[in-house]
């Protein structure tokens, strides 16, 4: 099947697979939210949160109108008016970012497939990687790709993977722990003289409205990032 400059097929799991772009063979491998994979062949491709691809997916700004291929072959127009956070880990590389997102209802979601190409005008700009439920009849559809400068994205080498932990109410974060605000400063000061040879770790703390990422040596915090949520979560919730 063809649309604009792409050729695509539907695989046995009912997902859409992009086979060619501009008559050049394409590779698109979609990952579950938060998934960790070990496959050295994937390192040769571009990586954006939730996808490994031979295609460079274009930078998009909020309020862009996109079109998503539906199961009947028509294009559904959607507006990017929200943001969300997604990540994956590939060969110990933590790839993360705040992504623009569209809101879809249950009826629209049922018309879309994982892997469905996403267009801006007639240009392929991304693919559907996942959905995230935010209400009884409301889902976020994140659009992954290169991020504009006003949205945080990046990648970090994480020798020991990424631990994901839900932020409890009224807690602050330092390093690998969350504590009440009146205790966090003392805890931070206590880490100043800890051994420099401790294991490094990366921890992602989350609540509905906020994401925190820390990179640490033992309990000593080296880096601390804060950005908006929500965290896109997998269908099977395994986060604490």
UniProtKB/Swiss-Prot annotation:
Origin species: Bombyx mori nuclear polyhedrosis virus
Record keywords, A-Z: Hydrolase, Nuclease
Subunit and interaction comment: Homodimer.
Function: Nuclease that cleaves host 2',3'-cGAMP.
Recorded superkingdom: Viruses
Active site: 46 (proton donor), 181 (shared with catalytic histidine of dimeric partner), 185 (proton acceptor)
Protein name: Poxin
Reaction it catalyzes: 2',3'-cGAMP + H2O = Gp(2'-5')Ap(3') + H(+)
GO molecular function, one term: 2',3'-cyclic GMP-AMP binding
Site, as annotated: Substrate binding: 93, 146, 226
Domain statement: The substrate binding site is formed by the N-terminus of a monomer and the C-terminus of the opposite monomer.
EC code: 3.1.-.-
Entry's family note: Belongs to the poxin family.
Database matches in Pfam families: Baculo_p26 (PF04766)
